[in-house]
Swiss-Prot record:
One Gene Ontology cellular component: nucleus
Cell compartment(s), UniProt: Nucleus
Predominant subcellular localization, coarse grouping: nucleus
Keywords: DNA-binding, Nucleus, Transcription, Transcription regulation
Keyword Ion transport: no
Annotated region (Disordered), positions in chain: 1-23, 38-82
InterPro entries noted in UniProt: B3_DNA-bd, DNA-bd_pseudobarrel_sf, REM16-like
Protein name: B3 domain-containing protein Os06g0194400
Residues annotated as transmembrane: none
Entries under CDD domains matching the protein: B3_DNA (cd10017)
Residues in the DNA-binding region annotation: 139-230
GO molecular function, a single term: DNA binding
A Pfam family annotated for this UniProt entry: B3
Length: 237
């Protein structure tokens, strides 16, 4: 019986020791878990959140920026605004067309010069050119149908335009022999007169075969002399 009691006591001691070992293992496991959890928390706190890295774009308030000036660098902002030559001259050409009316000349009444009339007008214009002298740049321009009917476009001599006339589109004033003035639009790239030339042509009843002498009396002003092709017949009387 004593032996049985001794065995029971040993068994109880073994169970107690085993229980204590299990509890000790549990405590170590819990400590280990807490350690890893703490490390994970520290690591996650040290890394910036992807959501935080993204910069939130400020939302513009309704109506904001409508009256605000365009932001530019100081160097660009201080530069003068470029003049809008094309817009200005388009408006100018419209005004010229309105002032002289929009109707085309009746092409059924076209006048066709004979070779004799044409030669006479050119020779008379060249004589006048010599009389006027070389104090001002000057050239002679015989009139064709395209100059005085239909298109009303007057091309100017290339060499003269390159040497004396503006390098960009500009208003050129024509002064006739009565000192009446007519504004025309000079197109630098095409080297000719556009808007306003039609009005000058109609006002002076220019026809095919007439010959004009252009004398540049100012940078953008021509004195214009007209030799009529019809004068050929007057010389025969």
């Amino acid at each position: 019986m004593i032996e049985a009691e001794s065995q029971m006591a040993e068994a109880a001691s073994y169970e107690e020791q085993r229980r204590r070992q299990v509890e000790a293992n549990k405590r170590k496991l819990e400590e280990l878990r807490l350690h890893h959890l703490s490390a994970a928390v520290r690591e996650s706190a040290s890394k910036p959140s992807p959501v935080k890295q993204r910069k939130r774009k400020a939302r513009a308030l309704p109506g904001a920026g409508e009256d605000a000036p365009l932001r530019r660098s100081g160097r660009v902002a201080n530069l003068p605004e470029k003049p809008k030559y094309r817009d200005e001259f388009q408006d100018f050409e419209k005004r010229i067309r309105r002032s002289y009316g929009g109707k085309r000349r009746d092409l059924s009444n076209r006048v066709y010069a004979t070779d004799e009339q044409r030669d006479y007008a050119i020779n008379a214009a060249q004589e006048l050119e010599e009389e006027l002298g070389s104090d001002y740049p000057i050239f002679v321009k015989p009139m064709l149908q395209s100059h005085v009917t239909g298109g009303f476009w007057l091309s100017l001599p290339t060499h003269f335009s390159r040497k004396y006339l503006p390098k960009r589109d500009e208003t050129i004033r024509l002064v006739d022999e009565e000192d009446d003035e007519f504004d025309t639009l000079y197109l630098a790239n095409k080297r000719g007169l556009s808007g306003g030339w039609r009005g000058f042509s109609i006002a002076h009843k220019l026809v095919d075969g007439d010959c004009l002498v252009f004398q540049l009396i100012q940078r953008t002003k021509f004195k214009v002399y007209i030799i009529r092709a019809s004068s050929y017949y007057e010389t025969d009387d």
